[in-house]
Structures are given as structure tokens and as C-alpha cells.
UniProtKB/Swiss-Prot annotation:
The lineage of its organism: Bacteria, Pseudomonadati, Pseudomonadota, Betaproteobacteria, Burkholderiales. Keywords: Plasmid. Coiled coil: none annotated. It comes from the Bacteria. The gene is hoxQ. This is Hydrogenase expression/formation protein HoxQ. Belongs to the HupH/HyaF family. It comes from Cupriavidus necator (strain ATCC 17699 / DSM 428 / KCTC 22496 / NCIMB 10442 / H16 / Stanier 337) (Ralstonia eutropha). InterPro entries: HupH_C_sf, HupH_Hydgase_express_prot_C.
């Protein structure tokens, strides 16, 4: 009798040739966390009383911050260079920064203490420099609202290759008609929709661009841009390879990702208290 050969077949993951390799989008690998500022020895900064006074004023503003009231503001115009440098060292740079373009320019940087914002505006005849404490600087909300100049969406002629953008624009226009401050945000998630490059281009051209650009570096990177339509924002998230992972339109007064939450302000109060104890100001 002849032996009948039984072929050996390898089984299990990796034993068989794959028809195609899945190319997964990499999600952000890191998350921005609070890092205490590196401070000089207390005796080295004992004479810098102006900066210490500003830090105590910020702590007081954090203690009484109320979203229903105007944000407390601390002016910095009287500080000399040494005191400014100490203040800059203590505040550091947090997750969110913003820029407002127009007749005058405004630069905004959140401190490592969330909800503490440094606001510098420049115009031909004056410069302002102050700290503002709150969810977001009021000038940011105002510029986005008053910088808009397109109160209705006119789709007009639809170019070739554009399929789904007109229906998205109709949804946005409908939401804008009924939206008012205090109403919950309405999000259009373009990532989940069959949007071609031509659709995205047509959408952005129709919404237009306005004066506010915000960058948030919390979990990955997020770019927020105001449009020419009031209360309408483009919000795009990127991973560490600069690949888009979420692309949205938001109808709101200011996207939540750009704002400090109430618990952030409470955490900042605790952290700044520890810093001031080290400095010897409290």
C-alpha cells in the first residue's frame, strides 16, 4: 500500500498571505497636561512686587470667576521689563492660542493655568496688554460675531463634482435661522459624510473666512476658524502626523474646545495658590 501524504498547513495569525494591508489612521498619542512652571528662588524675586501683585489679582479673579458676569481683567501696562519677565515665566503657555486679524491685531495666549489668558492688541496709535480670567476672552467672542458679514447663505451655481455640499449648506442655513446665544451647539460632522474634495472646497468658499483663528493643543491638534457667517465655525482636528481625523462645522457662539471649563478654573486656583506660596506672596 502506498502512503498517502498529508500536507502540513500552517494556521493562525500571520500564517497566511494577506490580500491587503489595512492602513489605520493614527490617533493622537499624547495629551497635554499641566506642568508646573520653573521658578527662581524666592529671594531672587522678592523685589519684583509688581508681578507678585498681578499674580495675587489673578488668584482673586479665579476665586470670584462667574460665567454670568464679565470676565475680570488685570492691566499690565504699568509693569517694567523685569516684572513682565517673571510674569511670563510663571504663566507659561497653555493649550490654546488665538489671533484676530483686522484693522488692529489681537494675540491671545492661554497660560498653563487654564482660564487665565494674556491678551495683547496692537493698532497704529496704541497697544493694550492685560490678563483676563474666564472661560474665554470676551474679545474673542465679539470679534467672531462682529467680524461676520454674511447673514444668509447663497449657494448660487454649483460647480461640477459637487454633490453633497448644497444639502449641508441648507442644513447650516436652517440652523442659523433659529440659533441664538445659549442654545446648544449644532455640529455637522463632515468626516462621517460622503464629501468629495470638491464638496469641501465649495463648502468653505460659500461659508467664507473671517478674522479669528484659534489653535488648541490638548488631545492632538485642533484648528478653529471663524467664517463669514455669524456663529458658524470650522473646527478641524489633526493627529500627530498632521492627518485630519475629524472635520466639522459648528453653530455656536464659541466652540467648546477653545474654552476653559469651570473645573479648569478651580484647578488653576489651586495650582496658582501653590505657586504663590513658593514665591512667598501669600
Amino acid at each position: 500500500m502506498n502512503s498517502f501524504p498529508i500536507p502540513v498547513v500552517l494556521l493562525g495569525p500571520g500564517s497566511q498571505a494577506e490580500d491587503e494591508t489595512l492602513d489605520y489612521i493614527h490617533m493622537p498619542q499624547g495629551m497635554s497636561v499641566y506642568t508646573p512652571p520653573v521658578l527662581p528662588e524666592p529671594e531672587q524675586i522678592a523685589c519684583l512686587t509688581q508681578a507678585q501683585s498681578v499674580l495675587r489679582a489673578i488668584l482673586d479673579a479665579l476665586d470670584r470667576a462667574d460665567p454670568k458676569q464679565p470676565n475680570p481683567r488685570i492691566e499690565l501696562w504699568a509693569l517694567d521689563e523685569e516684572n513682565r519677565q517673571l510674569l511670563k515665566q510663571v504663566l507659561g503657555e497653555g493649550e490654546v492660542s488665538a489671533r484676530i486679524e483686522g484693522e488692529y491685531q489681537v494675540y491671545i495666549q492661554e497660560a498653563v493655568f487654564a482660564g487665565v489668558w494674556r491678551v495683547v492688541s496692537t493698532c497704529p496709535d496704541a497697544t493694550t496688554d492685560y490678563i483676563e480670567v474666564g472661560a474665554a476672552p470676551e474679545v474673542l467672542r465679539g470679534a467672531a460675531r462682529y467680524g461676520a458679514n454674511q447673514w444668509s447663505l447663497d449657494v448660487g451655481r454649483v460647480p461640477d463634482g459637487v454633490m453633497n455640499a448644497p444639502s449641508i449648506l441648507a442644513e447650516i442655513d436652517d440652523q442659523l435661522l433659529s440659533w441664538h446665544p445659549g442654545k446648544p451647539v449644532h455640529v455637522v460632522n463632515l468626516t462621517l459624510l460622503p464629501m468629495s474634495p470638491q464638496d469641501i472646497t465649495f463648502l468653505d468658499e460659500t461659508l467664507g473666512a473671517a478674522s479669528v483663528t484659534i489653535l488648541s493643543r490638548g488631545y492632538g491638534n485642533c484648528r478653529i476658524s471663524s467664517t463669514a457667517v455669524p456663529y458658524c465655525w470650522r473646527v478641524v482636528y489633526f493627529n500627530s502626523q498632521d492627518t485630519t481625523i475629524l472635520n466639522t462645522v459648528e453653530i455656536t457662539d464659541l466652540p467648546e474646545v477653545a474654552c476653559a471649563a469651570p473645573e479648569d478654573l478651580r484647578d488653576s486656583h489651586e495650582r496658582l495658590t501653590e505657586v504663590l506660596k513658593w514665591v512667598g506672596s501669600i
